[in-house]
Structure formats: C-alpha cells, structure tokens
C-alpha cells in the first residue's frame, strides 16, 4: 500500500512527555514520559578476557533499553534513566534515535517505510538540529517523507476547532507551557517572529517542586522517595488559579473545612496508607506564574507583564491581532481560571498604557480600545499534537513534506526550511 494511503505518524516530543499517534485522530494514542533507561556500563578491567567480553556485549547492550513508563519503573534496576530532551531541545541524539525506535516499532507498531512523519520542533530550534532529525529519519528509519512543524503554529491551528470559520487566524500569541519550559511565541500569518520570542523559566516541573517545598516546610509525613510524585498528583488534582492571593488566604483562614482537601496515598515501601492535608498549596502552586518571586527570587516578572512587553516589541501592524488571539497550549495552562486571570491582567496593562497616552496628550488623543482575548479550548492539553494531526490529515501535507528522493538528491539541508501550508495562510 502506498504511503499516501496510510495515515501519517505524528510525534510531539516534549521535555516531560512525548505524544504520539496517527493523523486524523483527536487525541494521541500514546502519552509516555520522555525518558530512556540504558544499561549501566560494566566497570573497566585490565583482564583481556573481560575487555573482549565487554566488546562482544556492547552490541547487545545497545539494544537493551527501556523508554517511557518502563524506564521509570522500579523494576528497571541496573539501568540509568536519562532524558534526551532538556528545555524542549534535544541534547543527546544517540539516545533520541533509540527513543524514536521504540516509539515507532513498539508503540505505534508501524513500518516507518510505509508512513509519512510529522515531527514538532520548539521555537528557536537550530537548523543543525533539523538536519540531525532528517538524517535519523531518512537514513535510520528510511521514511518516505518528513515534515518538521513549529509547535506554536500547530497550537494556533488546534484552537480553530472551537471557533467559527471567520474567526480562524494564523496570527496570534501562543503561550506554550509544558513540564520543562514555557515559551511566549508571536506568530504572524503562520510565521514565527523569532526576534520577539520570550522564554519564561517557570513550567509544570517548577510548580511541582514549589508544592513539594511547601509540604516539606509543614513537615508532612510524606515518604521522602514519594514526595515529588505526591506533589505532582496534588498539583494535577487540586490546584487552581485564584483572582486575589490575599483574599484567598482569608477564605482558607475563615472556613478551612470548606476549602481544605485530603490526598490519600500508600507508602511504596511499607505499604501503609498515609494522607496529606492540602490547603494553601492549592492556589499558591499555579500562582508562581503571576508572582514568580514566590519560588525564584532571580526572576520576578509576571507572565502578564512578559506578554505585554513582548507584544509591544512586535511590528505595530500585528499587535492588535496578537492581543486578540492569545492561545493557551500545554498541560501547565490547564489550571482552572488560568485564562480568566491572564486575560484580566493583560487587559489591565494595555488599558493603563492607553490611558497614559491620552493623559500625556492632554486629551487630544483618543486611542481605540484594545480587545484582549485569551483562548482556552478543550484540545489545550494536547494542542500541539492535535494541530499536527489536523494538518497531517490534509492532502497538502504530502505536497509540502520533504521526500526521501529529495533527501538523497540534496542532503539533510532540505529540512532547514519547512514551508507553511498554503491552505492555512
């Protein structure tokens, strides 16, 4: 069967998790940790026989590894867990190739020669990294076609699912916050404005660490080896964004029984149950997006200020379009009322600037009000993957993808540039 007749494989590699599945589906078939467990190296020996055995076993050890949940399981003893992706960028290409190998053959159960592939890349990814990706995909896996899509553009596309046709736009500001990194990426007509991208050193993992430290300060009887996982479960199960921190403290102090929650767990070693009272952690965790000084004294700029400053640095003719289409993407933007508070704070900043302009002009200038819209939608958690699934299911995907024949003729440099879909612009 032709590769054009089979659905394309869509793989979104993130710092914490990898989403993979087939084009045309609304959700990824698999969501697995971006971790790989490799065999510990045997200690070196001066014995000639030992050196010979090590050389013979090296090839076998290369095949002896686990990825995803299996890599993190307690059963993976004598293995070292590594993360090939850091802050969204691939750092170890040998491990990444082995990771993709199991993604394709073990999870997707696909023959790579029979499917086109859509992979995602973070903002400001280097052209050299695209070339490395092309070399692995075309030479190691012999794929017939490859398209490397910018995550921000895919997230914008995913937001179309909840909007009318006349409201769909490829101009907008994407707030992509996953487990390891948060990026604010302005996009104009499908092209990323690279010089204006902002990086925020706060993401899901930082929230988990902050909640973990809050629980530790209260000297909770949480098993030390489970403290991180417990904090992570509390974050996902109980946390929300509050409109005013001080008023929220008063609410909890006035009627604690109404707002406190209890997390029940089991000690992984003694198998005895334990419970954790969850109070201020519910709203203080996500609040570090708006008050980063709570956990990081070196970074004190709220996310709303970062967004407003970023938009003001963009070309003047796209600024209103960016304010009107702030799209949320990634699991760390899923907290209840996150979109509402972000929209309120950004609106307050933009209105304050317009009012200052009018005041400084002595009332002669009457600026047109700016409409600030923060878009939250049901595909938000897997927005990047879902956007890739939408695009890879169109006929144009096969026209813009780089083929194996082009790669053999021109080399990996063809993947330095991946055209924007004409149907989207």
UniProtKB/Swiss-Prot annotation:
UniProt keyword annotations, A-Z: Actin-binding, ATP-binding, Cytoplasm, Cytoskeleton, Nucleotide-binding
An annotated GO BP: Arp2/3 complex-mediated actin nucleation
UniProt keyword Nucleotide-binding present: yes
SS bonds (residue pairs): none
InterPro entries the record matches: Actin, Actin/actin-like_CS, ATPase_NBD
One Pfam family here: Actin
Localisation: Cytoplasm, Cytoskeleton
Primary localization class, coarse: cytoplasm
A molecular-function term among this protein's GO annotations: ATP binding
Deleted gene: phenotype: RNAi-mediated knockdown suppresses the memory retention defects of the msi-1 os1 loss of function mutant.
A single Gene Ontology CC term: cytoplasm
Keyword Cytoplasm: yes
Function, as annotated: Functions as ATP-binding component of the Arp2/3 complex which is involved in regulation of actin polymerization and together with an activating nucleation-promoting factor (NPF) mediates the formation of branched actin networks. Seems to contact the pointed end of the daughter actin filament. Plays a role in time-dependent memory loss and the retention of conditioned behavior over time.
Family: Belongs to the actin family. ARP3 subfamily.
Assembly and binders: Component of the Arp2/3 complex, at least composed of arx-1, arx-2, arx-4 and arx-6.
Record-given protein name: Actin-related protein 3
Organism annotation: Caenorhabditis elegans
Source organism phylogeny: Eukaryota, Metazoa, Ecdysozoa, Nematoda, Chromadorea
């Amino acid at each position: 069967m032709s590769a054009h007749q089979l659905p394309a494989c869509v793989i979104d590699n993130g710092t914490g998790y990898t989403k993979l599945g087939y084009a045309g589906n609304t959700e990824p078939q698999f969501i697995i940790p971006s971790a790989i467990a490799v065999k510990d190296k045997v200690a070196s020996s001066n014995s000639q026989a030992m050196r010979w055995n090590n050389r013979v076993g090296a090839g076998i050890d290369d095949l002896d590894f686990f990825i995803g949940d299996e890599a993190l399981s307690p059963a993976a003893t004598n293995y070292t867990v590594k993360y090939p992706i850091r802050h969204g960028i691939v750092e170890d290409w040998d491990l990444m190739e082995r990771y993709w190998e199991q993604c394709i053959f073990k999870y997707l159960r696909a023959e790579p020669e029979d499917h086109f592939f859509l992979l995602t890349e973070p903002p400001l990814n280097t052209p050299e990294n695209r070339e490395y990706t092309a070399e692995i995909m075309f030479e190691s896996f012999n794929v017939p076609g490859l398209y490397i899509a910018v995550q921000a553009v895919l997230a914008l596309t995913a937001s179309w699912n909840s909007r009318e046709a006349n409201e769909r736009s490829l101009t907008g500001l994407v707030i992509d916050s996953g487990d390891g990194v948060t990026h604010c990426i302005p996009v104009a007509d499908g092209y990323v404005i690279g010089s204006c991208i902002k990086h925020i050193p706060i993401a899901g993992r930082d929230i988990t660490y902050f909640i973990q430290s809050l629980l530790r300060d209260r000297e909770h009887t949480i098993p030390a080896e489970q403290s991180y996982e417990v904090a992570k479960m509390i974050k996902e199960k109980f946390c929300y964004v509050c409109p005013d921190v001080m008023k929220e403290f008063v609410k909890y102090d006035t009627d604690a029984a109404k707002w406190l929650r209890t997390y029940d767990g089991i000690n992984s070693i003694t198998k005895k149950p334990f419970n954790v009272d969850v109070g201020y952690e519910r709203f203080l965790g996500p609040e570090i997006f708006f008050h980063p000084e709570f956990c990081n004294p070196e970074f004190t700029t709220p996310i709303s200020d970062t967004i407003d400053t970023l938009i003001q640095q963009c070309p003047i003719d796209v600024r209103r379009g960016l304010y009107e289409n702030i799209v949320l993407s990634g699991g760390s933007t899923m907290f209840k009322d996150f979109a509402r508070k972000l929209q309120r704070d950004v609106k307050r900043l933009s209105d304050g600037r317009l009012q200052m302009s009018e005041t400084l002009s002595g009332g002669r200038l009457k600026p047109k009000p700016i409409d600030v819209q923060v878009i939250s939608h049901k595909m938000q958690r897997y927005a990047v993957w879902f956007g890739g699934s939408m695009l890879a299911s169109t006929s144009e995907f096969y026209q813009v993808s780089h083929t194996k024949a082009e790669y053999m003729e021109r080399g990996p440099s063809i993947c330095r540039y991946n055209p924007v879909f004409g149907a989207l612009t």
